């Protein structure tokens, strides 16, 4: 669905050749949100993710898809695995002749930020403990 604002801005979500194209930015204004709460245990979630190398299966995907993407070795996550850990970042859509799952890496960024913050807190606590033990 596409929307045009009074100022002429175009926004929405589009599918093109099976790709889910989003905006270059995402609206994140607090005034647009409700029920705001922190993501629980983001570090635990991130540690369960398994980054992988892979190649697109040309026997399943149309050649147009493969040609429109980088060929050869890719890097990413497996949507089914991510869905078990962080289901909010996985979406299933009809692309070409099938229903396929995809990972919204933009949404995953919020979980990664939470994990870094949680890990940094642990580091600071350990540094404090080391300082106390050394004195």
Give the residues covered by each predicted segment.
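Short, surface-exposed loop/helix-turn segments at secondary-structure junctions
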Residues: 63-71
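C-terminal intramolecular chaperone/auto-processing assembly modules
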Residues: 28, 33-35, 65, 87-135
